[in-house]
């Protein structure tokens, strides 16, 4: 497992994730990206919106740490991240399903920008020190490595194989 111990490594991972997703979007093309059914009942656009929603959580965590606050997540307050995963994913879908692809892609890019900006500006102590924030009870790593690892694994393990298979189907 790749270890992230520097700001430069974290930024590199985020930039590689962006480049890989951008390449998949370019390969798919706009017409194919919005067709339902490529991912169960979902379109590639829906998958991008899902990834964007969770990247928004990454941005919220990083930005909250800049204010030394706990993060506030985009979904309704009654939903809990560790408990209501399917409901949160459904909320992401319902919130984004009627948006045009161009808006979904713009929001995706904005979340990447926010994550990169936060990683670039957070003090190293806040970014890399394990145990610095009490609300990161789900990881033994510092905030930066924890959230970047989560974003990377979410894409690479849970979604990239399906995206690659779908792209190969042409």
List PLM regions with ranges:
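Acidic/His metal-coordination segments adjacent to aromatic residues that form catalytic metal sites
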Residues: 2-6, 88-103, 137-146
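Extreme N-terminal tail/first-helix region
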Residues: 1-19
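Hydrophobic/aromatic residues within well-ordered alpha-helical segments
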Residues: 14-17, 51, 108-111, 152-155
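Structural signal for well-ordered, non-membrane alpha-helices
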Residues: 18, 22-29, 56-63, 109-123, ...
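Residues that form generic nucleotide/phosphate-binding pockets
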Residues: 13, 24, 65, 91, ...
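Short, contiguous alpha-helical
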Residues: 34-87, 127-170
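Acidic/histidine-rich alpha-helical segments that form the ligand environment
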Residues: 83-129
């Amino acid at each position: 497992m790749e270890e992230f111990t520097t700001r430069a490594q974290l930024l590199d991972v985020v930039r590689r994730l962006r480049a890989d997703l951008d390449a998949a979007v370019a390969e798919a093309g706009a017409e194919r990206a919005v067709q339902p059914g490529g991912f169960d009942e979902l379109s590639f656009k829906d998958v991008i919106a899902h990834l964007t929603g969770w990247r928004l959580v990454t941005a919220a965590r990083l930005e909250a740490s800049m204010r030394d606050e706990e993060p506030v997540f985009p979904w309704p307050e009654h939903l809990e991240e560790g408990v209501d995963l399917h409901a949160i994913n459904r909320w992401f879908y319902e919130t984004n399903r009627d948006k045009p692809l161009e808006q979904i892609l713009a929001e995706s890019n904005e979340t990447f920008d926010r994550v990169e900006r936060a990683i670039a500006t957070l003090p190293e102590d806040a970014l890399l020190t394990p145990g610095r924030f009490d609300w990161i009870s789900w990881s033994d790593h510092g905030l930066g490595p924890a959230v970047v690892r989560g974003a990377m694994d979410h894409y690479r393990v849970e979604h990239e194989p399906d995206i690659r298979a779908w792209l190969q189907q042409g």
